Amino acid sequence: MRALPLTIGTIHFVGIGGIGMSGIAEVLHNLGYAVQGSDISDNQNVRRLREAGIQVMIGHDAANLGTAQVVVISSAVGRDNPEVAAARAKLIPVVRRAEMLAELMRLKWAVAVGGTHGKTTTTSLIAAVLEAAQLDPTVINGGIINAYGTNTRLGAGEWMVVEADESDGSFLRLPAVIAVVTNMDPEHLDHWGTAEAMEAGYQQFVSNIPFYGFAVLCIDHPTVQKMIPQLSDHRIITYGFSPQADVRAERINTDKFGATFEVVITDRQTRRTRRTPPLRLPMLGEHNIANTLAAIAVAVEMGISDSVLQSAFASFKGVKRRFTKTGETGGITIIDDYGHHPVEIAAVLRAARQAGARDVIAVVQPHRYSRLASLFNEFCTCMNDAGTVIVADVYNAGESPIEGVDRDSLVDGLRTSGHKSVVPLPGPEHLAEMIHAIARPGDFVVCLGAGNITAWAQTLPEELATLQAKSSKIRRTGSGG
């Protein structure tokens, strides 16, 4: 891997504990650069970086800069941050996270994966395929890849796979050779302003690929399909379940452990088709089959064999917080999932049904007041696959409250939209007792959100088991008396 000039000095990351920032910091550290950083609080990413030998300071203070010669910030870091202000006062370059990622991407041939949903899993699947093909890729992902125990991988090969962040438009800076778009639903409109502006951003993202590159687009998504005529000067490959898709899944058989399917691949120029042998994916949900099709589209163009695909997918270990089982007690399964957009929530709850749940109990922690406000009607209608919905307070993620947009308004909205069983969660300390009162053997409890609900999902199995043991003891005592 060609190096950046070694004279750039120590690189300081403000907000290094974020998933995107931590990945770039770890890759630069593994390349031999002096890396340090700060974050407002300790978390798993901070601990992982420290274990790797990276100094991380808790809290933001001008003194944290030390001898840093470059400062990297995310879009969440404001100009009034004391470290950023100190860097500018010292005339130290301050670069955005996406700019630093773009510099790393220039050292390789890059695949960038964009979309409202499915980016992290699709990035992980492409990485798994390239690794199985012995292409030794470098990977920078937006979630922890279970096979790595981290969200990054430094490879010696010529290819890099990255998750492209559309939230602040910074994915337009990324110099990708292959651009993947999984879907486009209204999201991050606080940055884009309108859905039309967001769609134009995605079109620019794809248009940025060079003439020797190509775009991989999900034709099943109407907004993505609408973009195709505007890309006539670029090479594209479509995927999905539609008969119009160049890479199409057929003969799908699902069970509670995953899916087996075949893929029909059509050459856009010759219209010749071929069929792959059966592929096994140990993941639930039609949306994950779609993510796999995106990886197959990339692999086909890179000349990777079907046998490599079979091996890569069959051994795929998934991504942290993507339908992750945290425990099972008394026949009740606890699932932790990052889903926080209505489309994601609906897909995860469908997957729980597919897994053979007797019933599904959704525990939802809305993430950001602005998201709940802009997608309120969608939130009120996306949970029909849950027999019961438990709604927690909004995780504000630094936002100020919006009047009339809160836990209780969502509870009322779900009920008004026809959901038969919706209850507010007074606080996380009451979750286990509520689940104990509602859940029965065979049920799935699915904890959904991008906030601290993941911590609740981790402790819930043990808390629930304790309550079950107490109830069992009381029943035995009662029957014996």
Curated annotation (Swiss-Prot):
Subcellular localization(s) per the UniProt record: Cytoplasm
Q: What is its EC number?
A: 6.3.2.8
Instruction: Tell me one GO biological process term.
Output: peptidoglycan biosynthetic process
Q: Which UniProt keywords apply?
A: ATP-binding, Cell cycle, Cell division, Cell shape, Cell wall biogenesis/degradation, Cytoplasm, Ligase, Nucleotide-binding, Peptidoglycan synthesis
First-level EC class: ligase
Annotated residues that bind ATP are located at G115, T116, H117, G118, K119, T120, T121
Tell me which stretches of the chain form a coiled coil. Answer: none
Annotated GO MF terms = ATP binding; UDP-N-acetylmuramate-L-alanine ligase activity
Q: Which pathway is recorded for this entry?
A: Cell wall biogenesis; peptidoglycan biosynthesis
Instruction: State any GO CC term.
Output: cytoplasm
Q: Which reaction does it catalyse?
A: UDP-N-acetyl-alpha-D-muramate + L-alanine + ATP = UDP-N-acetyl-alpha-D-muramoyl-L-alanine + ADP + phosphate + H(+)
Please state which protein family the record places this protein in: Belongs to the MurCDEF family.
Its biological purpose is as follows:
Cell wall formation.
Q: What is this protein called?
A: UDP-N-acetylmuramate--L-alanine ligase
Gene name on record? murC
